[in-house]
A protein has these predicted regions:
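Juxtamembrane linker/hinge segments adjacent to a transmembrane helix in small membrane proteins
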Residues: 1-33, 146-156
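Generic recognition of flexible, low-complexity loop/linker segments
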Residues: 14-15, 53, 124
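Structured segments of extracytoplasmic/periplasmic soluble domains
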Residues: 6-10, 53-56, 60-63, 94-97, ...
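Beta-strand-connecting loop/turn residues
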Residues: 23-25, 62, 116
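Short beta-strand elements
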Residues: 12-21, 62-68, 107-110
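Periplasmic OmpA-like peptidoglycan-binding domain that tethers envelope proteins to the cell wall
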Residues: 28, 34-48, 57, 69-156
Length: 156
């Protein structure tokens, strides 16, 4: 709730969404305004917002997972080999901006490119595709629960 309140203006403007999923808080950055189409270059005017997010989450315990996402459209680019490449590079751009914040522990960062594997919408219309193009900053709170080891015996 503190994060939501601090980012209220950006949420109202449609640049961000904040969602609490229980053990994970997700801050969703829309592509529009953050990156040019088909590019991982984080727009200069958007960098202060990414630093503000890093400043807000630096005191929240847990792993900070930065995930890049794309739509399912083929990429026509000499810079990026695929949507995997583009989504990864966008996540890296955001993570590197977060690292610039004094006191932010980069050891907490995990960066991943998801391409079009976790869409929020189907990709039928341009507006639905635009919602899928995003970077998510997830703060994972709590430790994962691992099951007991299962022994495997070889059959003779």
């Amino acid at each position: 709730e503190t994060i939501k309140k601090a980012l209220e203006r950006e949420i109202d403007q449609g640049a961000l969404e904040v969602e609490n999923l229980g053990q994970e808080i997700v801050i969703r950055i829309r592509e529009k305004g953050a990156f040019p189409a088909g590019s991982a270059f984080l727009q200069p005017k958007f960098r202060p917002l990414v630093r503000q997010i890093a400043d807000l989450v630096k005191e929240v315990p847990g792993i900070v997972r930065v995930s890049g996402h794309t739509d399912n459209q083929a990429l026509d680019s000499e810079l990026y080999r695929s949507n995997w490449d583009l989504s990864s590079q966008r996540a890296v751009s955001v993570a590197q901006e977060m690292e610039k914040v004094r006191g932010f522990d980069h050891q907490r960062l995990r960066v991943r490119g998801m391409a079009d594997t976790e869409p929020l919408n189907n990709n039928e219309t341009p507006s639905m595709r635009s919602r899928n193009r995003r970077v998510e900053i997830g703060i994972l709170q709590g430790k994962p629960k691992y099951s007991d080891e299962v022994s495997v015996q070889q059959a003779n």
